[in-house]
């Protein structure tokens, strides 16, 4: 126990310290800053890019997520958003662009064609961008709405917040320890979809 001398009724030094200091772990602080300052690099290939470009308009206010500044070079980006049909000829340039991004880096696959090839089950289309890139978040739809991309950013932020990165100064170059989530998003939202009793025209709502 420590004693301090002060005037009666005056604020104690411990109270002043608690009001002016924030105590946290370094990993949590770094993860918090990373998830609120995503620098996206858009790679649009077909119709899904129109919806992705719509998400950048003031109507959806992507600045709320700290991802409003679109980078023109992969060397300044840490988030790659792949939207549209990925042909085999574009797979190699896309992989090279991903390799030019600095660590840590994340990938969002947007649309049915980027996720699984979509309706193009032919030799010239890559059947899922995850066959050569590590995808963090999948956005379903053909094409998905801008709100779906907003939800993908929120999911990616929650994933970044739980990533644990070792101290590279002491351990050398190592990758992040990413948590394993065995429950797909489709299964997590199934109960809410099954509880819908009234179906209506989307244009009427």
Swiss-Prot record:
<keyword id="KW-0520">NAD</keyword>
<keyword id="KW-0874">Quinone</keyword>
<keyword id="KW-0004">4Fe-4S</keyword>
<dbReference type="Pfam" id="PF01058">
    <property type="entry name" value="Oxidored_q6"/>
</dbReference>
<keyword id="KW-0479">Metal-binding</keyword>
<dbReference type="GO" id="GO:0005886">
    <property type="term" value="C:plasma membrane"/>
</dbReference>
<keyword id="KW-0472">Membrane</keyword>
<dbReference type="GO" id="GO:0009060">
    <property type="term" value="P:aerobic respiration"/>
</dbReference>
<dbReference type="GO" id="GO:0050136">
    <property type="term" value="F:NADH:ubiquinone reductase (non-electrogenic) activity"/>
</dbReference>
<keyword id="KW-1003">Cell membrane</keyword>
<keyword id="KW-0813">Transport</keyword>
<dbReference type="InterPro" id="IPR006137">
    <property type="entry name" value="NADH_UbQ_OxRdtase-like_20kDa"/>
</dbReference>
<keyword id="KW-0997">Cell inner membrane</keyword>
<dbReference type="InterPro" id="IPR006138">
    <property type="entry name" value="NADH_UQ_OxRdtase_20Kd_su"/>
</dbReference>
<feature type="binding site">
    <location>
        <position position="142"/>
    </location>
    <ligand>
        <name>[4Fe-4S] cluster</name>
    </ligand>
</feature>
<dbReference type="GO" id="GO:0008137">
    <property type="term" value="F:NADH dehydrogenase (ubiquinone) activity"/>
</dbReference>
<comment type="similarity">
    <text>Belongs to the complex I 20 kDa subunit family.</text>
</comment>
<comment type="subunit">
    <text>NDH-1 is composed of 14 different subunits. Subunits NuoB, C, D, E, F, and G constitute the peripheral sector of the complex.</text>
</comment>
<dbReference type="GO" id="GO:0045271">
    <property type="term" value="C:respiratory chain complex I"/>
</dbReference>
<feature type="region of interest" description="Disordered">
    <location>
        <begin position="171"/>
        <end position="205"/>
    </location>
</feature>
<feature type="binding site">
    <location>
        <position position="47"/>
    </location>
    <ligand>
        <name>[4Fe-4S] cluster</name>
    </ligand>
</feature>
<protein>
    <recommendedName>
        <fullName>NADH-quinone oxidoreductase subunit B 1</fullName>
        <ecNumber>7.1.1.-</ecNumber>
    </recommendedName>
</protein>
<keyword id="KW-0830">Ubiquinone</keyword>
<feature type="compositionally biased region" description="Basic and acidic residues">
    <location>
        <begin position="183"/>
        <end position="193"/>
    </location>
</feature>
<dbReference type="GO" id="GO:0015990">
    <property type="term" value="P:electron transport coupled proton transport"/>
</dbReference>
<feature type="binding site">
    <location>
        <position position="48"/>
    </location>
    <ligand>
        <name>[4Fe-4S] cluster</name>
    </ligand>
</feature>
<keyword id="KW-0411">Iron-sulfur</keyword>
<dbReference type="GO" id="GO:0048038">
    <property type="term" value="F:quinone binding"/>
</dbReference>
<keyword id="KW-1278">Translocase</keyword>
<keyword id="KW-0408">Iron</keyword>
<comment type="function">
    <text>NDH-1 shuttles electrons from NADH, via FMN and iron-sulfur (Fe-S) centers, to quinones in the respiratory chain. The immediate electron acceptor for the enzyme in this species is believed to be ubiquinone. Couples the redox reaction to proton translocation (for every two electrons transferred, four hydrogen ions are translocated across the cytoplasmic membrane), and thus conserves the redox energy in a proton gradient.</text>
</comment>
<dbReference type="GO" id="GO:0051539">
    <property type="term" value="F:4 iron, 4 sulfur cluster binding"/>
</dbReference>
<dbReference type="GO" id="GO:0005506">
    <property type="term" value="F:iron ion binding"/>
</dbReference>
<feature type="binding site">
    <location>
        <position position="113"/>
    </location>
    <ligand>
        <name>[4Fe-4S] cluster</name>
    </ligand>
</feature>
